[in-house]
Amino acid sequence: MSYFPILFFFFLKRCPSYTEPQNLTGVSEFLLLGLSEDPELQPVLAGLFLSMYLVTVLGNLLIILAVSSDSHLHTPMYFFLSNLSLADIGFTSTTVPKMIVDMQTHSRVISYEGCLTQMSFFVLFACMDDMLLSVMAYDRFVAICHPLHYRIIMNPRLCGFLILLSFFISLLDSQLHNLIMLQLTCFKDVDISNFFCDPSQLLHLRCSDTFINEMVIYFMGAIFGCLPISGILFSYYKIVSPILRVPTSDGKYKAFSTCGSHLAVVCLFYGTGLVGYLSSAVLPSPRKSMVASVMYTVVTPMLNPFIYSLRNKDIQSALCRLHGRIIKSHHLHPFCYMG
């Protein structure tokens, strides 16, 4: 997700001075597309998405707390997982709170500055998720294919470097998006066909030919769908053979369980992301394409803790030990006994 914006500069040009009257210059605000126009349905949707948002934040916070407080989880896999949880909190917090407030106030307005800010954080955290999922696939590859050298290869210095590298690439991607959008000086309309400031939707509003916009969207889908997934699938292609050679069924189950959870998250993240971007160019109804956007920005971060961690025995044991320490600190009996 970090390299394609550079190519945008070959496509994006300032709007010509002979623009037609319907083209708008100096736009100060945009109008977001709501999930429903029924005023009676707004409180129901607001309550639903508030519940999903709270589940997402609390679930990911539990993972971060469990990993940081338990020495048994101070391993590269859980270190990357806790950073993925942090990125998921930021990712969903970029769009969902604004959407809930809009539902409650029956407002669809977002300022130009607010739109660019939301877009920047959206790209930042989406790219962080993208990078971290790839890093986690590499971590599983090293753990299974090179178990004897795992601690040497995945040392704390390399783990920290991979996190910092992911962050700075994501930050660069975010700022390049900002620079690209600042090149747009006029728009055909102020209605964004999504519930947040999606970069692809903003490109649709610019004055130049929409054919280039559609090509850019397909290019984005190809780059950020095919290439990262290909890298992850290649890692798992290398992983399958060593797993099949594991002598014990328990060892095979543990390896497949870890890899299966990660692959489920990967498929959910990249699949809904690709569908969301491509459907915006294919489907005639904006509300139909918004279903994929909701899955991508709301449902996926909510399901990640359940898919990857909260069903993990190590995480459950860590949470149990943490609960026991909290109760002991209040001079009560521990919640559970861990032998």
UniProtKB/Swiss-Prot annotation:
Gene Ontology MF terms in the entry: G protein-coupled receptor activity; olfactory receptor activity
Gene3D superfamilies: Rhodopsin 7-helix transmembrane proteins
UniProt keyword annotations, A-Z: Cell membrane, Disulfide bond, G-protein coupled receptor, Glycoprotein, Membrane, Olfaction, Receptor, Sensory transduction, Transducer, Transmembrane, Transmembrane helix
Subcellular location: Cell membrane
One GO term of the biological process aspect: signal transduction
A single cellular component GO annotation: plasma membrane
Glycosylation sites per record: N23
Residue ranges crossing the lipid bilayer per the database entry: 44-64, 73-93, 118-138, 158-178, 216-235, 256-276, 290-310
Membrane topology: Multi-pass membrane protein
Cytoplasmic side: 65-72, 139-157, 236-255, 311-339
Highest rank taxon of the organism: Eukaryota
Spans within the Extracellular topological domain: 1-43, 94-117, 179-215, 277-289
Disulphide connectivity of cysteines: C115-C207
Function description: Odorant receptor.
Family: Belongs to the G-protein coupled receptor 1 family.
Protein name, entry field: Olfactory receptor 7E24
Annotated organism of origin: Homo sapiens (Human)
Lineage: Eukaryota, Metazoa, Chordata, Craniata, Vertebrata
